Structures are given as C-alpha cells and as structure tokens.
Amino acid sequence: NGPMIIIAGAGSGKTRVLTYRIAHLMNQGVDSFNILSLTFTNKAAREMKERIASVVGTAEAKNLWMGTFHSVFARILRSEADNLGFPSNFTIYDTQDSVRLLSSIIKEMNLEKDKYKPKQVLGRISQFKNSLITVKAYFNNSDLIEADKMANRPKMGEIYHHYVNRCFKAGAMDFDDLLLRTNELLTRFPEVLAKYQDRFRYIL
C-alpha cells in the first residue's frame, strides 16, 4: 500500500504483474469501484480487463475503471463538463478537425501560410497543452513568446487564443485538451478532486 514503480523491458511481464495485482486487491475485498487502471493503449486495457475477469469473474470486474489516459480523462470530463462550460456530449476533434480549424484561423488572420503551416502550428499548440501551458500561461511566459518570435512566428499566441476560443464555442476538445482540461478541472474544483480521490483508492 504505497507508491511503487516497476521498470522492465518489453515482454517481461509488466502487464501480468498489474493484472494480478488488481485481481489480488479484489480478492482481498477491495471493491472494483475503487480501482483505477491506466494504460497507454486500448489493446492493453482490453487484454487486462479480460485477464482480470477470467480471474475474479466478469461481474466482479464490471465496475473497474480501466483504459488509456485519454479515454479515462474523457470519461471524467463527460461527467463533469458543465463545471468547465462544456456540454457533456462535447465533440472530440481529431487531427484533421484541428488542422481544418487552424487553417481557417490562419486565413482569417491574413497570415502567411509559409510561416504558419497548420500542421506545424498544431504541433506547437500540442507542445503547450502537454506541458499544461494555457493561453494565459503562454502570454505570461516571456521565454515562450521570445522563442516564437525567433522562430519567425510572432502571432503564435494569438492563434492559440483563437483556436481555444473556437473549440470552446463549438463545444469541442482535441486530444490534448483531454489532458489539459482534466488538469484544469481537478485544479480549479477541489470538490471534484475530492470526489475522485475518495473513489479511487488504488491507481495502477
């Protein structure tokens, strides 16, 4: 009962260890409702859930929250979206949706396409979001602003601002938002954080 990290190479049995750790917890009386398991791929999540069900039974495993970081965070956000001003049925933009929106924004801002290529701009925005850098945080970070000026893209902050606003107005999030918005949710709303802390006693 405490933090633990397992470091091992591919095919060495990490998934098996996690699977049997979860099954052991459940056999010791821990309710599957109180267990959260995060994986990097949907395939791994499916395989783990099937293995656990084969050990403890399908009925026992049904309340287990298991999935990729993105799928689990999307599930949390759909339950709590109203706190952030989003509908519970918000749209999740894929890369093509995001590139299309950025192309429109870049055109509306009359920016040179050679300097602001939509896919590259999206990559930069993705870097911001995965570093938990919001639009406000960007404009408060002189190093980021200077870096974009040096890279000949001084309007990056404005594009980011418009992109976030347009997504919000459309009731949409992109894949990176699933991480950024969940962080925002749990940071801004302590009662929501407490709710999930109380529920998930074991996170693997």
Where are these regions (language model features)?
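P-loop NTPase Walker
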Residues: 1-88, 92-93, 99, 187, ...
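ATP-hydrolysis module of ASCE/P-loop NTPase motor domains
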Residues: 60-63, 82-177
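Conserved helicase NTPase motor core
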Residues: 2-10, 16-17, 36-37, 44-45, ...
